[in-house]
Amino acid sequence: MATQIIDDTPKTKGRRSGIGNILKPLNSEYGKVAPGWGTTPLMGIAMGLFAVFLVIILELYNSSVLLDGVSVSW
């Protein structure tokens, strides 16, 4: 029995729009990944600083034990 190949590509090109033409360059790098670690260390540092920020905010909100010596008068 022979295998039948069906072409699934659309026969029409679709409509072009001004917005599509503007946004097309933003999608040109889709799927490409730079080799190596890239900006991963910077993201790790940013996440660490954000975690410290959240801990400070939580301690201020809860008047934590670590801030017993600091007087806060709202």
UniProtKB/Swiss-Prot annotation:
One GO cellular component term of this record is: photosystem II
PTMs per UniProt: Phosphorylation is a light-dependent reaction catalyzed by a membrane-bound kinase; phosphorylation occurs on Thr residue(s) in the N-terminus of the protein.
Any single GO BP term: photosynthesis
- Give start-end ranges for the coiled-coil region(s): none
Keywords attached to this Swiss-Prot or TrEMBL record, sorted alphabetically, are: Chloroplast, Membrane, Phosphoprotein, Photosynthesis, Photosystem II, Plastid, Thylakoid, Transmembrane, Transmembrane helix
Signal peptide (residue range):
none
Instruction: Identify its membrane topology class.
Output: Single-pass membrane protein
A Pfam entry, by short name: PsbH
One term of GO molecular function: phosphate ion binding
Transmembrane portions of the chain: 41-61
Q: Which residues carry this modification: Phosphothreonine?
A: T3
Query: Is Cytoplasm one of the keywords?
Result: no
Q: Where in the cell is it found?
A: Plastid, Chloroplast thylakoid membrane
* Physiological role: One of the components of the core complex of photosystem II (PSII), required for its stability and/or assembly. PSII is a light-driven water:plastoquinone oxidoreductase that uses light energy to abstract electrons from H(2)O, generating O(2) and a proton gradient subsequently used for ATP formation. It consists of a core antenna complex that captures photons, and an electron transfer chain that converts photonic excitation into a charge separation.
- NCBIfam families named among the record's database cross-references: PRK02624.1
The record's PANTHER family line, in alphabetical order, gives: PHOTOSYSTEM II REACTION CENTER PROTEIN H
Q: How does it assemble?
A: PSII is composed of 1 copy each of membrane proteins PsbA, PsbB, PsbC, PsbD, PsbE, PsbF, PsbH, PsbI, PsbJ, PsbK, PsbL, PsbM, PsbT, PsbX, PsbY, PsbZ, Psb30/Ycf12, at least 3 peripheral proteins of the oxygen-evolving complex and a large number of cofactors. It forms dimeric complexes.
Per the record, the similarity remark reads:
Belongs to the PsbH family.
Q: What name goes with this protein?
A: Photosystem II reaction center protein H
> To which species is this protein native?
Anthoceros angustus (Hornwort)
